[in-house]
């Protein structure tokens, strides 16, 4: 672990309780995964700050490291990858899913990458922390009437007016966010009444995690700083002004949860 990459130990991002139980089985290389003694939420106690997360622990880097690790674990993981190749079809179907969820109007993609996820006729807007990806996304989105903001999620949301968006997409975002409640409150502010937030993120409560233990693909150090169960996500949604629906509740082995939150 790079000591420069750490900040003061975090309290629970779900309930702000200080006391937490160490989970050494799920900790690695000095990165300490803990369970809150107040609400049971699992999170990384010593999370890196944004600047170092971008420079030293970017998604592209940690993903590559994880891919090498899975290969080194041998035939078992290769078999798992082959058995779950259906996941590539889910990626192809994402555009149709978002069109069905949002219908039309202005939709914000938080962590938009290159800006090509949201299908027509949606008017795409984005927030992206990577300078290179933001530059690409901004060009793509401006051609369709939107634009992209270069900023972390919470700061990027501040650039938009209240009740501006018909929908918001956050795919693989909340597991990286040190203050997930603040991010959700920001989304709530920019959504119109009745607007929808579609979430996808690792499901710490899934069957695969219980079977795979520390080798579960949802563990990534140190850029995954929150580990949500469905119950954690539902509670946080209610506390920040949303109703909650677990979209893929009949897929207990799925590594990710899909959820639809609606602004009251």
For each feature predicted by the language model, list its residue ranges.
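Hydrophobic residues in well-ordered beta-strands that form the structural core
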Residues: 45, 199-201
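A structural motif corresponding to the C-terminal end of an alpha-helix
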Residues: 236-242
């Amino acid at each position: 672990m790079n000591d420069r990459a750490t900040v003061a130990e975090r309290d629970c991002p779900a309930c702000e309780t200080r006391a937490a139980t160490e989970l050494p089985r799920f900790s690695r290389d000095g990165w300490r995964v803990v369970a809150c003694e107040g609400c049971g939420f699992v999170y990384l106690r010593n999370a890196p700050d944004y600047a170092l997360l971008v420079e030293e622990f970017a998604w592209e880097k940690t993903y590559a490291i994880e891919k090498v690790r899975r290969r080194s674990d041998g035939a078992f993981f290769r078999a798992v990858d082959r058995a779950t190749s259906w996941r590539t079809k889910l990626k192809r179907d994402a555009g149709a899913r978002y069109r069905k969820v949002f219908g039309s109007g202005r939709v914000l993609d938080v962590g938009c990458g290159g800006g090509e996820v949201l299908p027509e006729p949606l008017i795409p807007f984005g927030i992206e922390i990577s300078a290179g990806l933001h530059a690409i996304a901004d060009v793509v989105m401006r051609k369709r009437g939107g634009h992209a903001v270069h900023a972390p999620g919470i700061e990027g949301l501040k650039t938009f007016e209240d009740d501006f968006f018909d929908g918001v997409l956050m795919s693989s975002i909340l597991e990286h966010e040190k203050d997930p409640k603040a991010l959700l409150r920001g989304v709530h502010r920019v959504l119109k009444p009745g607007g929808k937030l579609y979430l996808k993120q690792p499901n710490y409560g899934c069957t695969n995690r219980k079977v795979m233990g520390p080798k579960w693909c949802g563990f990534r150090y140190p850029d995954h700083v929150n580990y949500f169960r469905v119950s954690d996500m539902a509670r946080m949604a209610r506390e920040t002004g949303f109703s909650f629906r677990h979209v893929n509740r009949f897929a207990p082995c799925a590594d990710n949860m899909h959820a639809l939150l609606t602004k009251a």
